[in-house]
Curated annotation (Swiss-Prot):
The active site is at residues 179, 228, 298. Keywords: Cell cycle, Cell division, Cell shape, Cell wall biogenesis/degradation, Cytoplasm, FAD, Flavoprotein, NADP, Oxidoreductase, Peptidoglycan synthesis. It comes from the Bacteria. Pathway: Cell wall biogenesis; peptidoglycan biosynthesis. Its EC number is 1.3.1.98. This is UDP-N-acetylenolpyruvoylglucosamine reductase.
Length: 306
């Protein structure tokens, strides 16, 4: 069902909310690639109760997905059916629970988490400074960088299931593997508790600065990109395989494999999501032909083609 067609069905099919519910909401402005179609519905809940009540009353057949900063995401050009949930300011708070522990809202950015940890004298979460996303995405994906992953610091995650049920999941229950969790389809991460270690703020800041400088030197940070495109296969670096297959700088329309870091795809201007995803698939084919390794997407691809 198209967003335009679905708007007339709202009174009978979608529950009332206290937050904001928008029909046919363009998603391209909300994702880093600046491409893709619209959400059939975009829901920005007022608080956890608003989200829980909405999902509990929503027809179970309606698909639901969460959207953070949109940094590791391709939204296909036909848009996303169902409801896209975006956690705003009410979910972006970070608070210190004790000398080494933070409780972070699902909409809080990695920079906010690491900066709050620094100010509180908590080390160990500096790596979140380097991941362009929100806590909800980190927890779902077991986000990681510079030798650390969310599983190394997570105590528990607070989620609202597709049914509207609120659950607190332990580290073990999240079933983490490399860039993957056992979170069920449609579950929205609303908060997480991270535990680090006591550290002088100046030491934490120095590590954050080191990470920032390394990213600046090696990644196309000021581009329309989706971050790391492919997972690192066992025993390999994805970028090296892409480079060895002759894909550095490869283009399709306005989509390009970054020349600075070839595990990044770029939108040079007016690339469609089909251009970007198609370029990624071409890279996978070339790498398979060259090295025999099948690259697995790290970027999430959602929605439908036109």
């Amino acid at each position: 069902m198209s967003p335009a067609a679905s708007s007339a069905t709202r009174p009978s099919t979608l529950p009332p909310v206290r937050g904001r519910l928008t029909a046919g909401a363009p998603l391209a402005p909300l994702v880093w690639f600046k491409s893709g179609g619209a959400a059939e519905w975009l829901f920005e809940p007022a608080d956890v109760d608003d989200l829980s009540d909405f999902l509990a009353a929503l027809d179970p057949a309606v698909p639901v997905m969460g959207l953070g900063l949109g940094s590791n995401l391709i939204v296909r050009d036909g848009g996303v059916p169902g409801v896209v949930v975006r956690l705003g300011k009410p979910f972006a708070r970070v608070e210190r629970l004790d000398a080494t522990t933070l409780r972070c809202g699902g909409g809080a950015s990695g920079i906010l988490v690491s900066s709050t940890a620094r100010d509180a004298g908590i080390g160990g979460v500096e790596f979140l400074r380097s991941i362009p996303g929100t806590v909800g995405g980190f927890v779902r994906m077991n986000g990681g960088a510079y030798g650390r992953e969310v599983k190394d610091v997570l105590v528990e995650g607070e989620v609202v299931l597709r049914s509207g049920e609120r659950r607190v999941l332990s580290l073990a229950e999240l079933g983490y593997t490399y860039r993957h969790s056992a979170l069920p389809e449609g579950a929205i991460v609303v908060a997480a508790t991270f535990r680090g270690h006591a550290e002088a703020p100046a030491v934490v800041q120095a590590e954050m600065d080191r990470i920032a400088a390394e990213r600046e030197a090696s990644q196309p940070l000021r581009s329309r990109t989706g971050g790391s495109t492919f997972k690192n296969p066992q025993g390999h670096k994805a970028w090296q395989l892409v480079d060895a297959a002759g894909c550095r700088g490869l283009t399709r329309g306005d989509a390009q494999v970054s020349e600075k870091h070839c595990n990044f795809l770029l939108n040079l201007g007016t690339a469609s999501s089909a251009d970007i995803e198609g370029l990624g698939e071409e890279v996978r084919e070339r790498v398979k032909a060259n090295s025999g390794v099948t690259l697995e997407w790290e970027i999430q691809r959602v929605g439908v083609n036109p």
